[in-house]
């Protein structure tokens, strides 16, 4: 059985400002750095062998902090990037027009072909994050990888493993530096392949922060 841990990046400046990030970027806050250190402390006891991270700055920094604690090398994979949110990236949520807010709501309310102008659909996101996950099956026997990615990306990954469509209503909360675990297994009482063991664990954090889409 292959165990894969999933970690959302630490709190960023734009999270705190309720600003849409997508594939744009902002640095971790002091709280975000502390959250990443707490993940590192937890990960040190999990036997992590590989860290694979989105190549955006906020995930790279989170991965670097975790890697220092684990003593692991980091591989960067652009397929683990956040959903491309097109023309709304860098905008504060409270500043959106009614039309723009309608685009954003399509990403959370179950609109099958929803997307922000200039951005990705949830199905496109799902296809690439699943491709990144499938690469973990090529790691050496006994590996235990930890993937560092983003809130919508990881939420889509976990939800689709559970059998939901990529565009399903968004009802899974993954806070900054939460830890989830998925396993690739063969069981008599579970469907073969990927299963969800835990999702959104924040028991290792002193004060989990809310992101801009969860307030």
UniProtKB/Swiss-Prot annotation:
Q: Which PROSITE patterns match?
A: PG_MUTASE
EC number(s) per entry: 5.4.2.-
Q: What is this protein called?
A: Probable phosphoglycerate mutase GpmB
A Pfam family recorded for this sequence: His_Phos_1
Q: Which CDD domains match?
A: HP_PGM_like
The residues responsible for catalysis, as annotated, are: 9 (tele-phosphohistidine intermediate), 82 (proton donor/acceptor)
Source organism per entry reads Salmonella paratyphi A (strain AKU_12601)
Q: Which molecular function GO terms apply here?
A: phosphatase activity; phosphoglycerate mutase activity
In chain numbering, the residues marked as site (Transition state stabilizer) are 150
Q: Which UniProt keywords apply?
A: Glycolysis, Isomerase
Q: This protein's superkingdom?
A: Bacteria
Question: Sorted alphabetically, which Gene3D superfamilies does this protein's record hold?
Answer: Phosphoglycerate mutase-like (3.40.50.1240)
Give the gene symbol.
gpmB
Which GO biological-process labels does this protein carry? glycolytic process
UniProt similarity note: Belongs to the phosphoglycerate mutase family. GpmB subfamily.
NCBIfam families, per the entry: PRK03482.1
